[in-house]
Amino acid sequence: MEELLTVAAVARRLGVAPATLRTWARRYGIGPTEHESGSHRRYGRDDLAKLTTMRRLIIAGMSPAEAAEKALSTKSTPKLEKIVHGFSDRHDVIDALHNAAIAMDKNFIESLLRNDIEQYGVVRSWQEVIVPVLVHIGKSWEETGEGIEIEHFFSETLKRVFRESASEIKKPINPRPVLVASVGEEMHSLAIHALTAALAERNIECHFLGARTPFAALEAMVEKFAPPAIFLWAQLVENADPSFFRDLPAVRPAPRVLLGGPGWRGSDCAEMTQTPDLNFACEEIARAVGA
């Protein structure tokens, strides 16, 4: 038997207020069609599909009236690829991603990001679109104390897309992979996911160690593989321990060690190369591998 949903349940799924759904039903005729005896009308599978399409079209820039008309007149759900190809302005992409994150629409976010990365590359997508969305989400949480789940959801969706991009490398130009890690107890790893994906576009292969990488893991990888470059990320000051680059084992040829993240500061890091942005990190690593 088909599960029927209340207006509150559908509102949660779409990331809108129940009052908004009632307005859409009243103004545009896009609402619940199923009815259980002795209860309010409830939303069935087809109703939810139409509302999901309407929500995505609104996120993509359509007016609610146009989106409702399109959703009601289309027999099958429009492919996401067609919806996300309609953007020409970067600010529209930022707004769409932000709204899709609020709506927790994973498929829309992934499709839009894949399309954007295919058009502009990881570095431009990161700097022009993704970072602004993260800033918007972060500011909203700081101001209201709500929405921390949106940041986590969006970050994990981003990581999936970046891992997908990084896995597409087939013929790396570097026989010895670059080493990439978030050091110590550093839980933040989104930036190094972006870096690994951006390097993959240049056919530069990485050994990705991820978050909370202990020194022993770095030490073992350096001794085994003698990487041409090592990128160490620290978002927080308490995780930016200089021993992570000072005590690395000596290997030949010596690797290019780069530091990323706002955690690295002070005189201990003065002689190290710090990377101000993703593009700079990619260029430095490309030089280190001889690209």
Residue ranges of model-derived segments:
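Hydrophobic adenine-recognition pocket in adenosine-nucleotide-binding enzymes
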Residues: 10
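Short Gly/charged-rich anion-binding patches and loops
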Residues: 6, 19-20, 52, 194, ...
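A detector for short, charged/polar N-terminal pre-domain segments
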Residues: 1-5
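Long amphipathic alpha-helical segments
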Residues: 13, 18-170
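C-terminal regulatory/effector modules of DNA-binding transcriptional regulators
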Residues: 145-291
